[in-house]
Swiss-Prot record:
Presence of the UniProt keyword rRNA-binding in the record: yes
HAMAP family: Ribosomal_bL20
Species, as recorded: Rhodopirellula baltica (strain DSM 10527 / NCIMB 13988 / SH1)
Keyword set includes RNA-binding: yes
Domain of life (superkingdom): Bacteria
One Pfam family per UniProt: Ribosomal_L20
GO biological process, one term: ribosomal large subunit assembly
Gene that this sequence comes from: rplT
Protein's name according to its UniProt entry: Large ribosomal subunit protein bL20
Length: 118
């Protein structure tokens, strides 16, 4: 008797189409197109996991710069002052502090100003 790929092929296609749920047109219905689209989406996902890190760092720096300008400093001066003062806060926590804890951020800025003046 001739054997076919029946069950195995069905499972394989089912797995593919499950991953392609929500894709429009042939990208969600046609096996070859689905495979190509999934490969491409995987490549984008891989790339963008790295891009995300860059984007967030940029956002934190922009926020810190805006907050620091209100206290009469520039971002580069502020970071230099932080390092000189030995304050080990990362950019993420500094940006959160600038948004949610203005008083605490002001204290950090004052400490940096003292360190830079000395």
């Amino acid at each position: 008797m001739r054997t076919t790929k029946g069950a195995a092929r069905r499972q394989s296609k089912k797995r593919l189409f499950k991953r392609a749920k929500g894709f429009r047109g042939g990208r969600g219905n046609l096996t070859r197109t689905v495979k190509e689209t999934l490969l491409r989406s995987g490549a984008f996902a891989f790339r963008d996991r790295r891009v995300r890190k860059r984007e967030f760092r940029k956002l934190w720096i922009i926020r810190i710069n805006a907050a620091v300008k209100q206290h009469g400093l520039r971002y580069s001066e502020f970071i230099h002052g932080l390092n000189k003062a030995g304050i080990q806060l990362d950019r993420k926590s500094l940006s959160e502090m600038a948004i949610h804890d203005a008083a605490g951020f002001k204290q950090v800025c004052d400490k940096v100003k003292e360190t830079l003046a000395a």
